[in-house]
Regions:
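Flexible cytoplasmic inter-helical loops of multi-pass small-molecule transporters
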Residues: 2-29
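Structural signature of the two symmetry-related core transmembrane helices
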Residues: 105-120
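Intracellular juxtamembrane helix-capping segments at the cytosolic ends
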Residues: 143-156
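Extracytoplasmic gate region of multi-pass secondary transporters
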Residues: 30-96, 179
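Transmembrane alpha-helical cores of Major Facilitator Superfamily
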Residues: 49, 81-85, 112, 135, ...
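A late C-terminal transmembrane helix in Major Facilitator Superfamily
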Residues: 156-189
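Hydrophobic core of transmembrane alpha-helices in multi-pass small-molecule transporters
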Residues: 49, 129-143
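Helix-to-loop junctions at the C-terminal end of transmembrane segments
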Residues: 90-102, 187-188
């Protein structure tokens, strides 16, 4: 049993054999202690966490959100189909592009799409608001999956990946846990 392709003398996926001489060197592995002092870690982790906070709040309260603007349960649940299509499409495209580009543009697009989804959320009474909500949170969710899987290995190396991604995941889980409660409090007051 081997831990990784490198230990068997094999190349990792995504390396073009024709451009082997141009292949980037493997990122130096950093410990969680070092990573916690790196602003790049916090930018990516907090961006992923913020998306989880809002996304979970919307999903948990989808019916009451739509009822607040005079729309019914059927319209509320119909949000999920276009959002899933946008999410799957953006995930496939970003997964393909991630081997060719830096992650910063993907993060930027995720944050812009999140803002568009938020704009759709506050204008949900309009038809365009519905589509902007589905597009924004759908695309953002698809890009969220790419970033949560690639950013830490790419920036901080493989040796402490479990520790680093686990800490980031705990921030995301915490954010997604408080999102629905915070939304309820905001709705009540």
């Amino acid at each position: 049993i081997r831990d990784d392709p490198k230990s068997c003398g094999m190349r990792s996926d995504g390396i073009d054999l024709k451009s082997e001489e141009k292949a980037p060197l493997e990122t130096k592995s950093q410990t969680l202690y070092e990573v916690k002092r790196n602003p790049v870690f916090w930018i990516y982790s907090l961006s992923l966490s913020m998306h989880a906070l809002f996304g979970t709040a919307i999903v948990f309260h989808i019916i009451s959100i739509f009822e607040e603007v005079g729309k019914g349960k059927t319209e509320a649940f119909s949000y999920f189909i276009p959002a899933a299509i946008f999410s799957t499409t953006s995930n496939l495209l970003a997964s393909w592009a991630a081997d060719k580009i830096h992650l910063k543009p993907i993060l930027s697009i995720m944050l812009v799409s999140f803002c568009l989804g938020s704009l759709g959320f506050i204008n949900l009474q309009n038809n365009w608001g519905f589509w902007m909500l589905a597009f924004g949170f759908g695309v953002g969710g698809g890009l969220w999956g790419v970033l949560s899987n690639l950013s830490y290995i790419r920036f901080f190396g493989p040796n402490h990946l479990g520790e680093i991604s686990g800490f980031s995941a705990s921030l995301t889980v915490f954010a997604s846990a408080i999102g629905p409660a915070a939304f309820s409090l905001g709705f009540d007051y």
